[in-house]
């Protein structure tokens, strides 16, 4: 009898877990739809900025006439890399399966790769998971940003990227790389590594007679465009990462719900078997008692 009570208690516990994970799955699904739409809209805008900047980059020496202009360095990779700033995004919350693993693995591998080349790498961490992971590894973090990956904010994104750009222009770092696990579709996330600074022109078709006309003056446009390019790439990465996080959490909760259902089924079978054995034992005892009285 005590065994039956224990199995019944387990069934109730697993069933409650199943209801919780199913509710979390529904919440993540609803959040994913909103995040997916935001990511799609942002991606279109970010791609258009990339295209314009890519075309301008081929004419940069015509736009910026002064060879000592510090803005030129944003387009030219240095011959000797001594320091690299790595901005990476992880989740602030858990229960999202292996969502953070890709990013943390990529960052860890890059750390080893650059250290082997005697290149100093500075980490700017966005998200509680990544911060706690590298704190546990006793690896120093240059900057820590909590609650930004779970609630992307444009002004905060600007603050993050402006600090990195300023360090590049001031000569404190030679390259800025942005790493995050991005959204591909509802069941797939993909690791994205963006070599943000210096700017790498995207592969677009170039013509001798460019259709791009620069208004206002090229230098003014470049100033505004560069600012928008860096800010929006940072902001888009946050939105893209959040959509991927909701996707991963939805899958994780769906798997947990299905596992709970399977476990309840197993426990019900065990309960019925134990109950049958209990009844059989009682019947045998009754029959034995009757026989002994004859």
UniProtKB/Swiss-Prot annotation:
Family statement drawn from the similarity comment of this UniProt entry: Belongs to the ATPase gamma chain family.
Function according to Swiss-Prot or TrEMBL: Produces ATP from ADP in the presence of a proton gradient across the membrane. The gamma chain is believed to be important in regulating ATPase activity and the flow of protons through the CF(0) complex.
Gene3D superfamilies in the cross-refs: 3.40.1380.10, ATP synthase, gamma subunit, helix hairpin domain
Protein name listed in UniProt: ATP synthase gamma chain
Chief location bin: membrane
Membrane topology designation: Peripheral membrane protein
NCBIfam families, alphabetized: ATPsyn_F1gamma
Listed PANTHER family: ATP SYNTHASE GAMMA CHAIN, ATP SYNTHASE SUBUNIT GAMMA, MITOCHONDRIAL
GO cellular component terms, A-Z: plasma membrane; proton-transporting ATP synthase complex
A single BP term in Gene Ontology: proton motive force-driven plasma membrane ATP synthesis
Key words of the record: ATP synthesis, Cell inner membrane, Cell membrane, CF(1), Hydrogen ion transport, Ion transport, Membrane, Transport
Summary of subunit composition and partner proteins: F-type ATPases have 2 components, CF(1) - the catalytic core - and CF(0) - the membrane proton channel. CF(1) has five subunits: alpha(3), beta(3), gamma(1), delta(1), epsilon(1). CF(0) has three main subunits: a, b and c.
Compartments reported by the entry: Cell inner membrane
Matches recorded under HAMAP family: ATP_synth_gamma_bact
A Pfam family: ATP-synt
GO molecular function, one term: proton-transporting ATP synthase activity, rotational mechanism
């Amino acid at each position: 009898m005590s065994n039956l009570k224990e199995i019944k208690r387990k069934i109730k516990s697993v069933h409650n877990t199943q209801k919780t994970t199913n509710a979390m799955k529904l919440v993540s699904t609803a959040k994913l739809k909103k995040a997916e739409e935001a990511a799609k809209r942002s991606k279109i805008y970010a791609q258009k900025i990339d295209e314009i900047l890519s075309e301008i980059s081929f004419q940069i020496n015509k736009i910026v006439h002064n060879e000592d202009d510090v803005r030129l360095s944003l387009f030219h990779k240095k011959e000797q890399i001594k320091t690299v700033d790595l901005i990476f995004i992880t989740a602030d919350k858990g229960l999202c399966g292996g969502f953070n693993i890709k990013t943390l693995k990529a960052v860890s591998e890059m750390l080893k790769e650059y250290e082997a080349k005697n290149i100093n790498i500075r980490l700017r961490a966005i998200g509680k998971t990544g911060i706690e992971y590298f704190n546990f590894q006793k690896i120093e973090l240059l900057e820590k940003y909590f609650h930004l990956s779970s609630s992307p904010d444009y002004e905060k994104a600007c603050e993050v990227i402006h600090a990195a750009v300023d360090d590049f222009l001031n000569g404190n770092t030679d390259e800025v790389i942005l790493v995050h696990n991005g959204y591909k579709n509802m069941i797939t996330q993909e690791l994205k590594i963006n070599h943000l600074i210096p700017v790498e022109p995207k592969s677009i078709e170039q013509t001798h007679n460019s259709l791009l006309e620069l208004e206002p003056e090229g230098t003014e446009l470049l100033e505004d465009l560069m600012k928008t390019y860096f800010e929006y790439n940072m902001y888009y990465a946050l939105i893209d990462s959040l959509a991927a996080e909701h996707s991963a959490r939805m899958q994780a909760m769906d798997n947990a719900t299905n596992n709970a259902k399977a476990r309840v089924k197993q426990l019900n079978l065990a309960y019925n078997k134990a109950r049958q054995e209990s009844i059989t034992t009682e019947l045998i005892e009754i029959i034995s008692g009757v026989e002994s009285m004859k």
